[in-house]
């Protein structure tokens, strides 16, 4: 029976003892089964000289499965790069909540063994593309799996901006910022700010104002194909930013326009058979179990 995957990439949180232990265990276990293993260069040095070390771009190009060991933050960082390649991604949870990391670190063998035999479910998650435009020219751009957030930089204060959906004016805002989230990100920063949870199969985005200076401003859900434009008032101070997944920061100046839209790239998540999104929500968010 042919293998579902031939070349497997290992990615993890650098300088983390628990992650290093799990990566070494994975490397040994997978090598004994005859897989070709590539290790992302930031963690390869901690695993000894026998590892085949590559950068993340080469790993994405050469592997057909990537195993990310860490928390959701590590998964997000890897996903923004790997989404451009034809590669499946599965996670081993070494973080806190772990909405995107299905496998337990101490007993991954059974579930991962089934996945490697072809017994798995595939789920696609779309990404956001964020661009900062200044005087009609694009100054910077990046992608996000969870959310793009306009905010005032290091010191929290109110900012003024206008919101357009498909070039239609929606409203002006005086707030600490704006979160534009995918369904994947709806259980992250957006949830903490009062946004609704969107199931992963929804083709939608949610806009969540951060501490708006009005009682009538509420989160709104729009079609995923909508083009969102945030126009920053020229009266704002400097040092504004747009953050992508809380990792990548794009500088924003007064008068800039931020364009947020669905990316052509998408993440191919691999889940063990029987994966249930609502079970994940109950487990991670402490929801009540069935009464009868």
From Swiss-Prot:
Which domain of life does this protein belong to?
Answer: Bacteria
Example GO CC term: the record gives: cytoplasm
Active-site residues, record numbering mapped to chain? 72 (proton acceptor)
Presence of keyword Cytoplasm: yes
Locations listed in the record: Cytoplasm
Listed EC numbers:
2.7.1.23
Q: Please classify the protein's predominant subcellular localization into one broad category.
A: cytoplasm
Give any single GO term for biological process. NADP biosynthetic process
List the molecular function annotations (GO) for this entry: ATP binding; metal ion binding; NAD binding; NAD+ kinase activity
The keyword Hydrolase is annotated on this UniProt entry:
no
| Needed cofactors | a divalent metal cation
- Alphabetical list of Pfam families matching this protein: NAD_kinase (PF01513), NAD_kinase_C (PF20143)
> Which reaction does this chain catalyze?
NAD(+) + ATP = ADP + NADP(+) + H(+)
Keywords attached to this Swiss-Prot or TrEMBL record, sorted alphabetically, are: ATP-binding, Cytoplasm, Kinase, NAD, NADP, Nucleotide-binding, Transferase
Binding-site residues for NAD(+), renumbered to this chain: 72-73, 146-147, 157, 174, 176, 187-192
NCBIfam families linked: PRK01231.1, PRK03378.1
UniProt function note: Involved in the regulation of the intracellular balance of NAD and NADP, and is a key enzyme in the biosynthesis of NADP. Catalyzes specifically the phosphorylation on 2'-hydroxyl of the adenosine moiety of NAD to yield NADP.
UniProt lists the family membership as follows:
Belongs to the NAD kinase family.
Name of this protein: NAD kinase
Give the organism the record lists. Answer: Shewanella woodyi (strain ATCC 51908 / MS32)
Q: What gene makes this protein? A: nadK
